[in-house]
Amino acid sequence: MTAEHPARLPQAFMTPGSSSFVDFLAAHDPSLLPSSRALPAGSAPPAPHGTTIVAATFDGGVVVAGDRRATSGSMIAHREIEKVFAADEFSAVGIAGTAGLALELVRLFQLELEHYEKIEGTLLSLDGKANRLSTMIRGNLGLAMQGLAVVPLFAGFDLVERRGRIFSYDVTGGRYEELDHHSVGSGSVFARGALKKLWRPGLDAEAAVRVVVEALFDAADDDSATGGPDAVRQIWPVVATVSEAGYLRQGDDALESVVEDISLERTRQARSSRSRHGSLGGDLR
């Protein structure tokens, strides 16, 4: 049959099986999985790393944002990398860690969710999506132990509970649901401080977008691996909301307006602070 029909798909593609695309690859061509690759001990190559991702809930959904910088050691490897993606219509994933592996993991995760929907005829629940991502991260543990870790932040709108939810992970695939807001990556310590101060119950989507952008401002202020908004190059964070209406990426024009408002406010605060300190310091000569 194969000789007569050389373009025909192998039988494996025509046989009903698991609703997991990752399981399908593991059974029929495991070399295509990121987890199948092994490095000699201690030989992790220099690789660009994604840095800071933040997420916060609002009334009716969740917002996820990421800066645009990737670093390799002390060097800026990329200024416009995108780290926030739609996992499917009602969920988003942001990546921190080894950029190349993280991007491949996201593409495989997107395909996993699409494959499930086609096989089962329905969307996977939000908890189910979070668990699938956990399993995929666990499969990368061998590379993570050699310094090539991937640590995503997953968020989405729960169609059953009618609210936004946030999930964080560790390098072993451990899954943890976060309340209200969270951040991962090198600037996460500073971003979390901003989120704690600025987030409050009852935010609408517009206010939540401002909160996560301010959190990225604070992270970039203290973490050299996090890139702040760049008005000169017109580089803005990637910010997306997920609600009952689905995944929606914020446009550059809207983000530029938010960044300008925050910058003006912080400029006024800085000038006021300098003025006060100047008058209190006096001339010590």
UniProtKB/Swiss-Prot annotation:
GO terms for biological process: modification-dependent protein catabolic process; proteasomal protein catabolic process. The active site is at T51. The formation of the proteasomal ATPase ARC-20S proteasome complex, likely via the docking of the C-termini of ARC into the intersubunit pockets in the alpha-rings, may trigger opening of the gate for substrate entry. Interconversion between the open-gate and close-gate conformations leads to a dynamic regulation of the 20S proteasome proteolysis activity. Its main location: cytoplasm. It catalyses: Cleavage of peptide bonds with very broad specificity. The 20S proteasome core is composed of 14 alpha and 14 beta subunits that assemble into four stacked heptameric rings, resulting in a barrel-shaped structure. The two inner rings, each composed of seven catalytic beta subunits, are sandwiched by two outer rings, each composed of seven alpha subunits. The catalytic chamber with the active sites is on the inside of the barrel. Has a gated structure, the ends of the cylinder being occluded by the N-termini of the alpha-subunits. Is capped by the proteasome-associated ATPase, ARC. This is Proteasome subunit beta. It comes from Sanguibacter keddieii (strain ATCC 51767 / DSM 10542 / NCFB 3025 / ST-74).
